[in-house]
Amino acid sequence: MAFVSLLTILLAISSSSVALTEPVASMADQGVFPEQHGRGHHGVFPEEHGRGHHRGGREEEREENPYVFHSDRFRIRASSEAGEIRALPNFGEVSELLEGISRYRVTCIEMKPNTVMLPHYIDAKWILYVTGGRGYIAYVQQNELVKRKLEEGDVFGVPSGHTFYLVNNDDHNSLRIASLLRTESTMRGEYEPFYVAGGRNPETVYSAFSDDVLEAAFNTDVQKLEHIFGAHRRGVIFYANEEQIREMMRRGGFSAESTSASEQPKPFNLRNQKPDFENDNGRFTRAGPKDNPFLDSVDVTVGFGVLNPGTMTAPSHNTKATSIAIVMEGEGRIEMACPHLGQEHGWSSPRERGHQDINYERVRARLRTGTVYVVPAGHPITEIASTNGRLEILWFDINTSGNEREFLAGKNNVLQTLEKEVRHLSFNIPRGEEIEEVLQAQKDQVILRGPQRQRRDEPRSSS
């Protein structure tokens, strides 16, 4: 019983919980992920009934779980028969709990085979991750065109205000991109595209200028300008024929004909890098400010993790960074401790009752391909993979300089670092060896065997 009592102290979270009651937020619905082909109105996930706090017989998930997003929260930014761009809303609009990351936006892009995205720039720094397909990106830097090939697993950054375009030169597969924007607009969390080429659909930035200004700027008659700037009506993403695509590829620029262009950053592939951590349960790879100058400029770390079937990440938290995670493939679930939701439910606070009566809400959600979830700094979380297959997760850590990951369980758990006497006094367990037995029972670290595999493979420590 002593062991059970200690385990309860170590792992207890309020019995109240927040569960999803509708399909979880999915960019899979938008075709960002190659294994998802349909885009039905109701998404790809069956409705799940919750077991948390109910109001009127049903949870108000938007109010009580602001950390996981439904597919209907994605907004179409641009759409045509050749592809589309979608974005989550401003995080600050979703909940006051997310105002600290309102400057950041999550977007997704799908471009059908043999398509081009119009040249434009945005008032945001753009970190892209290629979730499927291949193609290339071209952007203007120091009055030169820099072209970089893209393939699945690549990470690349485009500075704010620099004109760029994307090309899918594949004959068969769509180019799919998930990305994070850090907006630079005076309107916090808002970003806009500025098209320097186009016509009627979409309009270009030239449409805002008067005819006489344009005539003078281009030294060209306004009738000819109207013909040029009014011809395109095919949308932001449009088809090109195979010969046009081949000509763009023949034109070169990938090896950079000038010294200044060759010095520009190149994509790096997270999937092909040596893992930062790996054991029998899974692995993860990450790149941050110290590894890439663009990531340094936005203070973001990008990571990619794989959990093998039936495994879990050890409960842990970021000391400083907030994580925005996207499930690339697989199924599972998350559990996260949150003190703020407990306060929203009206539970007593230390000031009200005069003692440290703190309640942690268990935030939980099913994970499927395309689920997006936010993990605020300091919030302990665990991701648990289904026994049916691997769980692959892409994440962006925001405000990552000086951040550390502290593990609350596993061989390297933070309690092991504390002085033994402090551990014994803090848990108020007379026999100190019981505490040490519990803390040393787990031989793995970072990625562990999950609940189902633990029950199947070996008995737990008991006394």
From Swiss-Prot:
Cu cation binds at residues 338, 340, 379. Residues 40-64, 252-280 are annotated as: Disordered. Stable up to 80 degrees Celsius. Transmembrane segments: none annotated. The record marks 55-56, 260-261, 353-354 as: Cleavage. The keyword Signal applies. It comes from the Eukaryota. SUPFAM superfamilies: RmlC-like cupins. InterPro entries: Cupin_1 (IPR006045), RmlC-like_jellyroll (IPR014710), RmlC_Cupin_sf (IPR011051), Seed_Storage-Functional (IPR050253). PANTHER family: CUPINCIN, OS03G0336100 PROTEIN-RELATED. Homotrimer. This is Vicilin Pin k 2.0101. It comes from Pinus koraiensis (Korean pine).
